[in-house]
């Protein structure tokens, strides 16, 4: 009997903020299970979930609009602590008798909050002190509207020069509201505030740990598939590798891993995957050479969304064919993780926009013949890596930079051709090799090369050549929801450029991408 790791849990109501998923990630980092639901849940659903506490997220709407989202009134009647963040604070204030107004002074970015009154939420938490000894907190604001009157049974805990009610509290009911975003790293003490709310005020134990998550996942897999056989597409990436190890632990030889060499992989990746999982870990692996099939399906296609859908469709076709060669395979396992789901579809509030479909999610056809097993779909990337370490996977593999499911299919811009993939593989291998040699690989969060379908004139010796262009991309990020371009040294970039142009015949120019996320995404397609 596995321990109930969902015993203490936090319910996060999503009002559509771009930061909502970060709130969930922070709560999980504190060792507490949480779920992210749409704001318009019913009282019965909340009762059934039985949360230890509720967090109301931020959102893009204005609480002053007549039809703007509101928290279910039961949230404030359930007898559990409630923490409103930004929009969540504003709707809490309005619903409990306070007042919110639109403001000409939009507060966006860094702000300093002065703590005026003692509160369980921020007691003993400070970044600095005022001249008269009052605590100051460095926070990140992102709001237009602001609370102009708090409910009568609340007190003002903190304020800024332009925001008189930056933190409000009803200590007796354990209701708290903050006008800033504690979940983002720019709010320096934000994690401590969330910890104070989740662990102390809600009294949640740290039951959500890698070892316990593994036990729970193994039990769920066994319950879902029983004695059925499962097929998994194993790419050697973090997500599919951890999925393979979890399934191997749960069902052993009833798992067949299919390694599809689709012609869209990194240099020497096929050999590395077969060696590690076949020879070292002893998993049952079928190697399927399918480069020609994928490239034929992609021929003539320039649209990024269409390419992702094609790659997803052909993957499923290959899996179906391999499954038919085996007896009674009823389940297709995938390494879908929580950010895949978040980025691929609008949130249940309908406020988030579809950015791109992931081949693990949006690219799967409705007529897929097998059931889906997705043991990682509620986990963030950092949780997946920690689970992988617990399962015995090597650190270097788990902390390798992310690689997209469609592979080079979305790193070759426009039409995908074998010639382009071969050039890109070699250029990318040089970039990664030089990053490791310069001890820069672990200092950036993700680095890769993009093939641009653009020819540029170059000079080699006494002759001119007219060859292809590649772009180097390196970013720094904590959560992959936002990212800064990495300021790599000029001499390093020059060395990489020289090597690529001299060693990869067919590339005449190398550029460096200096776009952040937002407005750009990390991948080009």
UniProtKB/Swiss-Prot annotation:
Source organism, top-level taxon: Bacteria
InterPro entries: Class_I_gatase-like, GATASE, GMP_synth_C, GMP_synth_GATase, GMP_synthase, GMPS_ATP_PPase_dom, NAD/GMP_synthase, Rossmann-like_a/b/a_fold
Matching Pfam families: GATase, GMP_synt_C, NAD_synthase
GO MF, one example: ATP binding
One GO term describing the cellular component: cytosol
Binding site residues for ATP: 235-241
Residues in Glutamine amidotransferase type-1 domain copies: 9-207
Residues in GMPS ATP-PPase domain copies: 208-400
Catalytic activity, EC: 6.3.5.2
Keywords, comma-separated and alphabetical: ATP-binding, Glutamine amidotransferase, GMP biosynthesis, Ligase, Nucleotide-binding, Purine biosynthesis
Pathway terms, separated by semicolons: Purine metabolism; GMP biosynthesis; GMP from XMP (L-Gln route): step 1/1
Active site per UniProt: 86 (nucleophile), 181, 183
Catalytic reaction(s) noted: XMP + L-glutamine + ATP + H2O = GMP + L-glutamate + AMP + diphosphate + 2 H(+)
Complex formation: Homodimer.
Function summary: Catalyzes the synthesis of GMP from XMP.
Descriptive protein name: GMP synthase [glutamine-hydrolyzing]
Organism: Salmonella paratyphi B (strain ATCC BAA-1250 / SPB7)
């Amino acid at each position: 009997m596995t321990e109930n790791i969902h015993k203490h849990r936090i319910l996060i109501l999503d009002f559509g903020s771009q930061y909502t998923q970060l709130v969930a990630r922070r709560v999980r980092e504190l060792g507490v299970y949480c779920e992210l639901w749409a704001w318009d849940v019913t009282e019965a659903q909340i009762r059934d979930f039985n949360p230890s506490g509720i967090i109301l997220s931020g959102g893009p709407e204005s609480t002053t609009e007549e039809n703007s989202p509101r928290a279910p009134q039961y949230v404030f009647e359930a007898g559990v602590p409630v923490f409103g963040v930004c929009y969540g604070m504003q709707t809490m204030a309005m619903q409990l008798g306070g007042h919110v107004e639109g403001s000409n002074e939009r507060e966006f970015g860094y702000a300093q909050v002065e703590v005026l009154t003692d509160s369980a939420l921020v007691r003993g938490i400070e970044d600095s002190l005022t001249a008269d000894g009052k605590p100051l907190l460095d926070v990140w604001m992102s709001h237009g509207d602001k609370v102009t009157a708090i409910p009568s049974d609340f007190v003002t805990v903190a304020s800024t020069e332009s925001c008189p009610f930056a933190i409000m509290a009803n200590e007796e009911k354990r209701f708290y509201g903050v006008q800033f975003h504690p979940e983002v790293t720019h709010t320096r003490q934000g994690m401590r505030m969330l910890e104070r709310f989740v662990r102390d005020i809600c009294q949640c134990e740290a039951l959500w740990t890698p070892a316990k998550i593994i036990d729970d996942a193994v039990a769920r897999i066994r319950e879902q598939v029983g004695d059925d056989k499962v097929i998994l597409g194993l790419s050697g990436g973090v997500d599919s590798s951890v999925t393979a190890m979890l399934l191997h632990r749960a069902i052993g030889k009833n798992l067949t891993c299919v390694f599809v060499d689709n012609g869209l992989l990194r240099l020497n990746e096929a050999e590395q995957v077969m060696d590690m999982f076949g020879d070292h870990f002893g998993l049952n692996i079928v190697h399927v050479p399918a480069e020609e099939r994928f490239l034929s399906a992609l021929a003539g296609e320039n649209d990024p969304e269409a390419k992702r859908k094609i790659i997803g469709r052909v993957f499923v076709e290959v899996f179906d064919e391999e499954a038919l060669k085996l007896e009674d395979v009823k389940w297709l396992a995938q390494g879908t993780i929580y950010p895949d789901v978040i980025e691929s579809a609008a949130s249940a509030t309908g406020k988030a926009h579809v950015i791109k479909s992931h081949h693990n999610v949006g690219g799967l056809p409705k007529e897929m013949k097998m059931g889906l097993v997705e043991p990682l779909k509620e986990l963030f990337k950092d949780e997946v890596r920690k689970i992988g370490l617990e399962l015995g996977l090597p650190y270097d593999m788990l902390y390798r930079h992310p690689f997209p499911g469609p592979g080079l299919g979305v790193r070759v811009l426009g039409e995908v051709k074998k010639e382009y993939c071969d050039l890109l593989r070699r250029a990318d291998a040089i970039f990664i090799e030089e990053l490791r040699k310069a001890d820069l690989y672990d200092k950036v969060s993700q680095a890769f090369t993009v093939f641009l379908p653009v020819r540029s004139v170059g000079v080699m010796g006494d002759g001119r050549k007219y060859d292809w262009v590649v772009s180097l991309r390196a970013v720094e990020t904590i959560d992959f929801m936002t990212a800064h371009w990495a300021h790599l040294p000029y001499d390093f970039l020059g060395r990489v450029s020289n090597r690529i142009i001299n060693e990869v015949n067919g590339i005449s120019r190398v550029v460096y991408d200096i776009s952040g996320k937002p407005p750009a995404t990390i991948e080009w397609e």
